[in-house]
From Swiss-Prot:
InterPro entries: Endonuclease-I, His-Me_finger_sf. Its EC number is 3.1.21.1. Has double-strand break activity. Pfam families: Endonuclease_1 (PF04231). The keyword Transmembrane helix does not apply. The lineage of its organism: Bacteria, Pseudomonadati, Pseudomonadota, Gammaproteobacteria, Enterobacterales. It comes from Buchnera aphidicola subsp. Acyrthosiphon pisum (strain APS) (Acyrthosiphon pisum symbiotic bacterium). The gene is endA. This is Endonuclease-1.
Amino acid sequence: MKKFCFLKIEKIKNDKKNVYCYNKYVFFFSSNKRSYFKKKTIENFYQAKIISIKIHKNAPGSFYCGCQIIWKQKKGIPNLYSCGYKIRKNKNRATRIEWEHVVPAWQFGHQKTCWKKGGRKKCMEDKKYKHIESDLHNLQPAIGEINGDRSNFMYGQLNNSVAQYGRCNMKIDFKRKIVEPPERARGAIARTYFYMNKKYNIILSEKERKMFTIWDKIFPVTKWECEREKLIFNIQGNHNDYVYKHCYKK
């Protein structure tokens, strides 16, 4: 039987029920290698990142570029050759996986009082902000350089633009602060924005809503999206209905 823990904290063991408790998480293991997770709370972004590693162990690649990910304990290393990625500028961040907020932290945080007083760091004291920041549905494994370059830029269409990252068709207009993501990520992006809009009232402009509606239709839910959604539900306890409804159609 394979054990798993997020933090090295004292273990409570119940041999009869086969239950292992770490921190505030309870993990149930069965002999058929299927594991069931019951979530009490995810307290912060750090914990969410550690959990996300477990969720994405079998991901088909990095979110935007589709690079193979080599996981080493708490670190993810992208195989840049596997997707033809070309480093634009930041080699250090290009050689590691970071956890990208599809809906950026700035978008759901900048209007808060804590953000106005001290930015994202100050909002670490705000429980509601921390809850949104650590929502697993909004976190994706991305090449660090892409995560940094995307920053808090909004998604959009960039006509006559050239990709800056080799065969990874990610386009960023740094002056206009607009990102055109590769097609492989557009459907998931749209469904994440719709989820965040519904759950946390994240504002969508009419232009964004129309664009995401098109992306949602053109790029349907993938098998991996369904697998990921199920894993997140088992841990976090809620569905992204914009994914879930397509996974179990009768």
